[in-house]
Amino acid sequence: MNATQEQLKVKLEQALIAAFGDEYAGVDPILVTASNPKFGDYQANVALSLSKKLGQPPRAIASAIVEKLDVSEICETPEIAGPGFINLKLKTAYLEAQLNAIQADSRLGVPTAKHPQREIVDFSSPNIAKEMHVGHLRSTIIGDSIARILEFRGHDVLRLNHVGDWGTQFGMLITYLREVSPEALTTANALDIGDLVSFYRQAKQRFDADEAFQETARQEVVRLQAGATDTLHAWKLLCEQSRQEFQVIYDLLDVKLTERGESFYNPLLPTVVEGLEASGLLVENQGAKCVFLDGFTNREGEPLPLIVQKSDGGYNYATTDLAALRYRIQKDEAKRIVYVTDAGQANHFAQFFQVARKAGWIPNDVELVHVPFGLVLGEDGKKFKTRSGDTVRLRDLLDEAVSRAHADLEERLKAEEREETPEFIDKVAEVVGISAVKYADLSQNRTSNYIFSYDKMLDLKGNTAPYMLYAYARIQGISRKGGINFADLGDNAKVILQHDTEFALAKYLLQLGEVISTVEADLLPNRLCEYLYELSKKFNTFYDRNQGVQVLSAEEPLRTSRLVLCDLTARTLKLGLSLLGIQVLERM
């Protein structure tokens, strides 16, 4: 809800009490944005909801509310429409004052959260000795955008990368490398990441087929857990090599993370089991220690347990996740913990959240949120893979997007007979390519699957990153064409609204805070994408020579006023795109 809506809501609540008494304090006035501008800007529907309780027709209730409603500083005289809707139209002077205020505000009128708190966003989380693939794309960029929005709202955000850096796979890989490439276990970067991944696959095949190899691999895991010097050194080298490769991707995507892998929680795993035992939740079932869950059954309809210690004494993902959760609440003092993973893990989160609640580990003031997302599909509607059927490497996907953006730009420059330096072309292609991939993902409702299409995401038309970047660059072009520095307009430059397209743009600019606040609550970045796309369209209509207004050739004071609207649009686009992890371009 934006500042204007907040004010109107308070005024309506006061009018309700004045008209019908104190018992109506706290009644929701049901204030919504008007669906049609001809009915005003906002509509309160509370009269219809109170008709039965008050035993009066909705129009009579609406009249009684309007009689006590004092919104003269904000709105024109309220009107009652239809069965009892209260329509509110913002005054031009009020709109102008609001725009002048955000023009002087570096945050564009977006307030910080009333109660800032420590929040954790757990995202990306690739596995050591494996390359990041298209499956990591969504977690990484959705998590990054959520973290950026929470940070902008003033929360203290810890961005955690829960890397898969522990487990049986290391015993398997180290055992295999001792045979085929022992130098990789003693020397940094003896292998490139592609070879490491290939050896991992070969090790897995050997592990599945050879019992003697399996036994040796398990002994290697025991040595690792016991801290054997050579095995621990080998493990650290393998982790560091993968870490370097991950960092290349994170740098390309401009994503910041604090790594805290599964191994970090190893010393805490026994205390998880002890804690569950002490709370009376732990049951031994076929030698394994587990907790039975409410609402989860197997195919036979029998209660489904969450295993926290295997019959051989080993631990699993659930144990690690429970240890991590306790640490994040007790040591990190997080008040909201957000996990960004694919929707296929929804049951896992529901299960270990339930166990933690039953154990009393989650205080009432701590919120746990699983942020699920759908699959990335190929244009055939199936899971996105290479032609050979392999999973698409994330690095290859990003490189291809940049390469295509490069080719598109060179083609456009040729058509425009325009010359640019190779450095300019490379920079623009990288920003456009990476931004296109990010925006194509973030603009979808994250709970849905989406089809990955280079052609669509790189299109200069439609709800795409290139369209947004072009809208921003176009406004910077206006300043260059007019020889104007927007920063020099100054806080004294006043907005004057006359034309319909000016009003439409102005009202939309004032909705940014409401949109960001909504995304903070529901963690759906596509809402911000929709807002920025609509804003770009409204600006293009405002600037259109047939539908809109003259800007540079307008007489003063309208010229300066319209330049302020241009500047506010550009700043809103820049801020909004930055919260999606997208940088803008002054020229394209």
Curated annotation (Swiss-Prot):
A Pfam family this chain is assigned to: DALR_1
Gene3D superfamilies given in the database record: Arginyl tRNA synthetase N-terminal domain, HUPs, Isoleucyl-tRNA Synthetase, Domain 1
Gene Ontology BP term (one): arginyl-tRNA aminoacylation
A GO-annotated cellular component: cytoplasm
Signal sequence interval, chain numbering: none
Positions of short motif 'HIGH' region: 126-136
Keywords carried by this UniProt record: Aminoacyl-tRNA synthetase, ATP-binding, Cytoplasm, Ligase, Nucleotide-binding, Protein biosynthesis
TM spans (from-to): none
Protein EC: 6.1.1.19
An example molecular function term from Gene Ontology annotations: arginine-tRNA ligase activity
Superkingdom to which the source organism belongs: Bacteria
Compartments reported by the entry: Cytoplasm
Enzyme class, first EC level, given as a word: ligase
Catalytic reaction equation(s): tRNA(Arg) + L-arginine + ATP = L-arginyl-tRNA(Arg) + AMP + diphosphate
InterPro entries registered for this protein in UniProt: aa-tRNA-synth_I_CS, Arg-tRNA-ligase, Arg-tRNA-synth_N, Arg-tRNA-synth_N_sf, ArgRS_core, DALR_anticod-bd, Rossmann-like_a/b/a_fold, tRNAsynth_Ia_anticodon-bd
Family to which the UniProt record says this protein belongs: Belongs to the class-I aminoacyl-tRNA synthetase family.
Quaternary structure, from the entry: Monomer.
Protein name per Swiss-Prot or TrEMBL: Arginine--tRNA ligase
Gene: argS
